[in-house]
Amino acid sequence: MDLKSAIRTIPDYPEPGIQFRDVTTLIGDARAFRVAIDRMVQPWAGAKIDKVAGTEARGFILGGAVAHQLSVGFVPVRKRGKLPWRTLREDYELEYGQDTIEIHVDAIAEGDRVLLVDDLIATGGTAEASIKLLQRAGATVVGATFIIDLPELGGAERIEAMGVPVSSLVAYEGT
């Protein structure tokens, strides 16, 4: 199945010149969603994975499904202030400012082997911050998987430079 055909492109969103890749159409299509999850799991099926971590918000949907397929637990990587208990946090730079992500202090056990899941990798800033946070919590991040890669923005290369293998299902040239 051609997964690109299940992803809606919205021109000039959220600002002029940006081509927004909307995976909500993919996850709303039962067949495309199933194919995407199966393909996200496949490269990691033989790896020993203890947990899947997914970044807010679409990474929750995808990561939960991947964790289910792998029969492992799920760790939500949330925006600051959204988790109700004690947290570890990681600040990271955005194009215009800074943001913070968090996980609960007990979400990861020392030595847990974790797969990071999100819908899209662009510059890699959020993925890098997530990996640093998971590593600080004691995890070994065994890989990162995405539906979409925007290779011109260099995110996958940035994550691979951290020693974390990356897989993605489709690539779009340009932004």
UniProtKB/Swiss-Prot annotation:
Pfam families: Pribosyltran
Lineage: superkingdom: Bacteria
One GO CC term, this protein: cytoplasm
Pathway(s) the chain acts in: Purine metabolism; AMP biosynthesis via salvage pathway; AMP from adenine: step 1/1
Keyword check for Transmembrane helix: no
Alphabetical list of CDD domains matching this protein: PRTases_typeI (cd06223)
Keyword Cytoplasm: yes
Coiled-coil regions, chain positions: none
Subcellular location: Cytoplasm
E.C. number: 2.4.2.7
A single GO BP: AMP salvage
Catalytic activity: AMP + diphosphate = 5-phospho-alpha-D-ribose 1-diphosphate + adenine
GO function terms (MF aspect): adenine binding; adenine phosphoribosyltransferase activity; AMP binding
Keyword vocabulary terms for this entry: Cytoplasm, Glycosyltransferase, Purine salvage, Transferase
Oligomeric form and interacting partners: Homodimer.
Family that this chain belongs to: Belongs to the purine/pyrimidine phosphoribosyltransferase family.
Xref: NCBIfam families: apt, PRK02304.1-3, PRK02304.1-5
General function of this protein: Catalyzes a salvage reaction resulting in the formation of AMP, that is energically less costly than de novo synthesis.
Stored HAMAP family: Aden_phosphoribosyltr
Entry protein name: Adenine phosphoribosyltransferase
Organism of origin: Maricaulis maris (strain MCS10)
Gene: apt
